[in-house]
């Protein structure tokens, strides 16, 4: 007999509660007034927020955490233990959960249980999930529909990566990285695009498509991006959208204008003009994300005037071209891009702000400096050729060593390997092995007028505050 996640009062314990996906689930469960504890070896503003909401946070992973929590909440009722794919069977806390007889669930099991409670919208796809789900959540929130939100990135306008609403909708980001996407069922599913991005889990693109096919079958309605050939040909959906009117999709655009301050376009719905939008985000991929959000919100019955007003106020998710500050004429921006397609799109958007002379940033930059930390050995190895050709818009490139994310190096692969590959296409390429070396190298390379764009899903952005302090101190000394 399969044991289901209990949302009616049984306590929860999260192993790795500080992760961006785990913390979102923990926040919603905590706000549902259920007893929650969790462990994470890294304290952060996210774990601090959970503690303020009432969760008990342990700063190490140990068997005693579960024993203490079990005694505190109720004798004889063991907590439900939630873990992600990153938690291995040899983890001490995981083993303690098994020994104590606690039911252990993958985080996707909890998300699936929450999706069943609401009229749910689940956003899947290789790229654009966080921005699209954040947009939908923000549009519903601005319209007074008070959604519950569980997404994989922090949205300033929503106060973070999760919220418990009183409305009937739940907006969730649906992650395909470990194959658990197949467990999720939703009233509305969205597929933004399909590429091979997790070679550590999938052997080829067909395996990825199979996972998305199961997800598609589990959704009552599927909103599909027809600009992605794989989606268009294999999973066309019940509702379609495209930036190309010639494709004949249900939702499309024309009169598109990309300027430094954002994007303008006219929106069409099944051949009828809805009106013009202004989106304070750049590049075609963000307009595509907005079109997916429009399709979802229109299907839910929202009027276009409310959608247009909401889009104009959406400033994006954190670590998605996020301005972090400036000093001595150098502007620092943080972006989560870690796949060749994402890098190319983000760098193109940054280049546009320089070439157009119109920027979302406080000042129009003069030079684009791309600082990239590759994420995972498996991804770097699988897409080395694609990565090498992704940095064309940059004037200068600095590559750090690979953020392993728990993987072992399969051989002699390093950031230097990638830097050498990029150097075949780019003249001004540099390599620095670790964060300290990155910081010191940037002291030598950066100059007034630069846009220092930090790219990657690892911890590279930890350098940004130190650089801001360095240049601020230099100014004070002067």
From Swiss-Prot:
Provide any one GO MF term from the record.
ATP binding
* Subcellular location, record wording: Cytoplasm
Gene Ontology BP term (one): cell wall organization
Keywords, ordered alphabetically: ATP-binding, Cell cycle, Cell division, Cell shape, Cell wall biogenesis/degradation, Cytoplasm, Ligase, Nucleotide-binding, Peptidoglycan synthesis
Q: What is the E.C. number?
A: 6.3.2.8
Record keywords: Cell wall biogenesis/degradation included?
A: yes
Name the residues that bind ATP.
Answer: 125-131
Q: Which reactions does this protein catalyse?
A: UDP-N-acetyl-alpha-D-muramate + L-alanine + ATP = UDP-N-acetyl-alpha-D-muramoyl-L-alanine + ADP + phosphate + H(+)
Associated pathway: Cell wall biogenesis; peptidoglycan biosynthesis
Show the PANTHER family listed in the entry.
Answer: UDP-N-ACETYLMURAMATE--L-ALANINE LIGASE, UDP-N-ACETYLMURAMATE--L-ALANINE LIGASE-RELATED
Q: What is the protein's name according to its record?
A: UDP-N-acetylmuramate--L-alanine ligase
The species this protein was found in = Synechococcus sp. (strain ATCC 27144 / PCC 6301 / SAUG 1402/1)
């Amino acid at each position: 007999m399969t044991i289901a996640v209990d949302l009616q009062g049984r306590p929860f314990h999260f192993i790795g509660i500080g992760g961006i996906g785990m913390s979102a689930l923990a926040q919603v469960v905590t706000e549902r007034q259920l007893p929650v504890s969790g462990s994470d070896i890294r304290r952060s503003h996210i774990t601090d927020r959970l503690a303020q909401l009432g969760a008990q946070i342990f700063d190490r992973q140990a068997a005693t955490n579960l024993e203490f929590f079990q005694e505190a909440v109720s004798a004889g009722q063991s907590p439900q233990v939630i873990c992600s794919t990153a938690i291995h069977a040899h983890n001490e806390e995981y083993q303690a959960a098994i020994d104590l007889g606690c039911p252990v669930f993958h985080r996707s099991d909890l998300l699936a249980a929450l999706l069943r409670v609401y009229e749910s919208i689940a956003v899947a796809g290789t790229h654009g999930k966080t921005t699209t789900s954040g947009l939908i959540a923000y549009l519903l929130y601005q319209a007074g529909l008070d959604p519950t939100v569980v997404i994989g990135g922090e949205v300033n306008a929503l106060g973070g990566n999760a919220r418990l609403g009183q409305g009937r909708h739940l907006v969730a980001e649906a992650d395909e990285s470990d194959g658990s996407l197949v467990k999720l069922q939703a009233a509305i599913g969205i597929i933004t695009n399909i590429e091979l991005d997790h070679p550590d889990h999938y052997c080829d693109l067909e395996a990825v498509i199979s996972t998305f096919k199961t997800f598609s079958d589990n959704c009552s309605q599927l909103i599909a991006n027809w600009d992605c050939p794989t989606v268009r040909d294999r999973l066309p959906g019940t509702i379609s959208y495209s930036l190309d009117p010639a494709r004949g999709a249900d939702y499309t655009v024309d009169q598109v204008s990309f300027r430094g301050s954002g994007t303008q376009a006219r929106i069409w719905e099944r051949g009828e003009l809805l009106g013009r939008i202004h989106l304070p985000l750049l590049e075609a991929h963000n307009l595509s994300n907005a079109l997916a959000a429009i399709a979802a919100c229109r299907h839910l019955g929202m009027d276009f005037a409310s959608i247009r007003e909401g889009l104009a106020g959406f400033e994006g998710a954190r670590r998605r071209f996020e301005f972090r500050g400036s000093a001595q004429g150098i502007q620092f921006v943080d972006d989560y891009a870690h796949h060749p397609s994402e890098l190319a799109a983000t760098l193109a958007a940054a280049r546009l702000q320089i070439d157009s002379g119109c920027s979302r940033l406080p000042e129009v930059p003069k030079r684009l400096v791309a600082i990239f930390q590759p994420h995972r050995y498996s991804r770097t190895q699988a897409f080395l050729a694609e990565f090498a050709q992704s940095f064309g818009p940059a004037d200068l490139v600095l590559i750090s060593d690979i953020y392993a994310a728990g993987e072992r190096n399969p051989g002699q692969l390093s950031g230097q390997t990638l830097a050498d590959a990029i150097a075949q296409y780019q003249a001004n390429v540099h390599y620095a092995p670790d964060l300290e070396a990155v910081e010191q190298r940037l002291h030598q390379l950066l100059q007034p007028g630069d846009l220092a764009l930090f790219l990657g899903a690892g911890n590279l952005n930890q350098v940004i505050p130190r650089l801001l302090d360095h240049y601020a101190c230099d100014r004070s000394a002067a």
